[in-house]
Each structure stands twice: as structure tokens, then as C-alpha cells.
Amino acid sequence: MVWSRDQRRKVALENPQMQNSEISKQLGCQWKMLTEAEKRPFFEEAQRLQAMHRE
């Protein structure tokens, strides 16, 4: 969610005509292409945000 939130804004700004469902499909493909090392900071940030929310 952390990664997709930022990426969704970028894609929507670059492609204002694109439907939300199309953006989601594109983001899904992009996410799958990332390596585990590239994904790790986003997982860590999500965990940090979850911990803050629980407090």
C-alpha cells in the first residue's frame, strides 16, 4: 500500500485519461517486476505505520 499510494499519484498525473482499474493493473505489473530487495523498504515502512497506529 505504501508503494502503490505514491505510484498511483504519479501514474494518474502522467495519464489523466486512465481509469482507476487500468492504473491498478499497471501498478500490479510494476510491483511484480520489483525484486525483494526493492520491495523491502516498503514492507518495513508499512510495518512501522502499523505499529504507530496500534499505539
Swiss-Prot record:
It is found in: Nucleus speckle; Cytoplasm; Nucleus. GO terms for biological process: cell differentiation; sex differentiation. One of its GO terms (molecular function) is calmodulin binding. GO terms for cellular component: cytoplasm; nuclear speck; nucleus. The keyword Nucleus applies. InterPro entries: HMG_box_dom (IPR009071), HMG_box_dom_sf (IPR036910), SRY-related_HMG-box_TF-like (IPR050140). It comes from the Eukaryota. SMART domains: HMG (SM00398). Keywords: Activator, Calmodulin-binding, Cytoplasm, Differentiation, DNA-binding, Nucleus, Sexual differentiation, Transcription, Transcription regulation. Residues 1-55 bind DNA. Interacts with CALM, EP300, HDAC3, KPNB1, ZNF208 isoform KRAB-O, PARP1, SLC9A3R2 and WT1. The interaction with EP300 modulates its DNA-binding activity. The interaction with KPNB1 is sensitive to dissociation by Ran in the GTP-bound form. Interaction with PARP1 impaired its DNA-binding activity. Transcriptional regulator that controls a genetic switch in male development. It is necessary and sufficient for initiating male sex determination by directing the development of supporting cell precursors (pre-Sertoli cells) as Sertoli rather than granulosa cells. Involved in different aspects of gene regulation including promoter activation or repression. Binds to the DNA consensus sequence 5'-[AT]AACAA[AT]-3'. SRY HMG box recognizes DNA by partial intercalation in the minor groove and promotes DNA bending. Also involved in pre-mRNA splicing. Belongs to the SRY family. This is Sex-determining region Y protein. It comes from Meles meles.
